[in-house]
Amino acid sequence: MLRFLSFGSGSSGNCYLLYTDTDCLMIDCGVGIRSLKKHFHNYGLQLNMVHNVLITHDHADHVKSVGSISGDLQLPVYTTEDVHRGLSQNWCVRRKVDQQYVKFVQKGEEITIGEFKVTPFGVPHDSTDCVGYSVEYEGIRFTLITDCGHITDEIALFISISNYLVIEANHEPEKLAAGPYPRHLKERISGPNGHLSNEACAKALVENASPALRHVWLCHLSDENNHPELAKKTIEAVLRDSGIIIGKEFTLEVLKRKIPSEMYELNP
């Protein structure tokens, strides 16, 4: 049985868990190590069940605890060479990943990590480098796309073959435009290497979701420029106008910024 948990999704910290009875992948590690230990305990899980870590990019809200968990548990950390370079230079990562645990991935090349087949793919974002991950386990395909400025053809392909999808819905353009952020930050967020809006997320689903898609989680919502109900309502409306009925075609939920999700069982 494949299971999924979110321990945090947003600028305050991102961390996701994909696991079976005998193997466990952590995707990003931007939640504090004390909070992680508490979350694992609350779910009746052990931190040492994690066998490998995947990192999407080197911004602090995705990596601040990766050196600690890797060093304490002797965990390999997989990401691109450029992201690893960014990690080694990131002052927010106080404890660096020891060289013996540094593992490189190549975009577009599938690798086997424990029980999982993992394919990293490029994601446009203004970090040193950025990737999403598509993970296959016993015929189930789970894909995570976060911190994404725009949808590329490659990203569209992975959406189209996914059964379970975590995808960014960061902001509502009108709230961003009217909000308190300085102009340069608004332009960064809304730019081609920034973050997906609710509308851009909805468009990606309309254009690429297949009948195989069962469940979608919206991730990395802005606290200032979005709201869970607004994101879900906006995306549901766009989907409905295109003939896609939530609950009939697939399920849609929002991952909370600071509160862990429920534990989801991902069925074939």
Question: Each PLM stretch: what is its role?
Answer:
Residues M1-Y43, V131-D147, Y164:
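Conserved beta-strand hairpin/beta-sheet module of binuclear metal-dependent hydrolase folds
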Residues I33-T80:
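Active-site metal-binding motif and surrounding structural segment of the metallo-beta-lactamase
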Residues S12, A60-V63, R85-G86, T128, ...:
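Active-site environment of divalent metal-dependent phosphoester hydrolases
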Residues E81-G132, E136-G139:
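Metallo-beta-lactamase
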Residues L5-C15, D58-H62, V66, P120:
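Structured catalytic core of nucleotide-sugar glycosyltransferases
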Residues D153-T251:
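Cap/insert and terminal regions of metallo-dependent hydrolase folds
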Residues M26-G30, V50-D58, Y78-E81, T143-T146, ...:
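Active-site neighborhood of phospho(di)ester-bond hydrolases with catalytic His/Asp-centered motifs
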Residues K64-L73, S88-W91, N226-K233:
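Metal-dependent catalytic neighborhoods of phosphoester/phosphodiester hydrolases
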